[in-house]
Amino acid sequence: IWSVAPLAREFEIPALIHADDRYRLADPAGSSMAAAREQLLAMTKNSLELTEPDDVQLLPPGRDAEIELVGIRFAVRHAPGHTEGSAVFQAERGDDVDVLFSGDVLFQGSIGRTDLPGGSPDQMNESLRDVIWPMTDEIVVLPGHGPHTTIGQERASNPFLQAAGSRRDAHAPNRGW
């Protein structure tokens, strides 16, 4: 998020963000305290531009939305936990394998931190259980950083996703007659 303003300006594109995270465009630490801002700037040798881009478009409200960017349809799912407005974007590619841009929600073998301002372990667990777990195994996951993976690989090996899946199964209605 720290590079959004310069990228949006350079490529003349809007910044898409969930309404719950809009404040982070100018305040990525989630705090308006001067000391936190100064620490962020010092850590990055004053290379951050902590400002909102000129063109900010809020993602449609609600848990699910569909948008089209450069001719590609995306299913957008609100997936709070790392931040209040975390979202994942699933590129729907027809006969090809779908791709999930997971941001800081899901990584290979891990998940986004929930101990930072705006994070919530409970919301992350719900997002993993209700948004990520039901996805098909073949979906390629491109996280905000780190190596790519697939939903199937994470379902088989990611302890956070496995725990969320077991909670989902425990809450499933008993269909036995």
What do these predicted ranges mean?
Residues 14, 66-68, 92:
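Solvent-exposed, well-ordered amphipathic alpha-helical segments
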Residues 6-9, 20-78, 83-177:
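Metallo-beta-lactamase
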Residues 1-2, 24-26, 150-151:
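Short active-site-adjacent helix-start/loop capping segments
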Residues 1-13, 82-89:
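Di-metal (Zn2+ and/or Mg2+/Mn2+) metal-binding site signature of metallo-dependent hydrolases
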Residues 2, 20, 118-119:
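Residues at secondary-structure transition points
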Residues 15, 56-58, 132, 141:
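Conserved beta-strand scaffold positions in the cores of enzyme catalytic domains, especially
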Residues 16-19, 144:
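Generic beta-sheet signal
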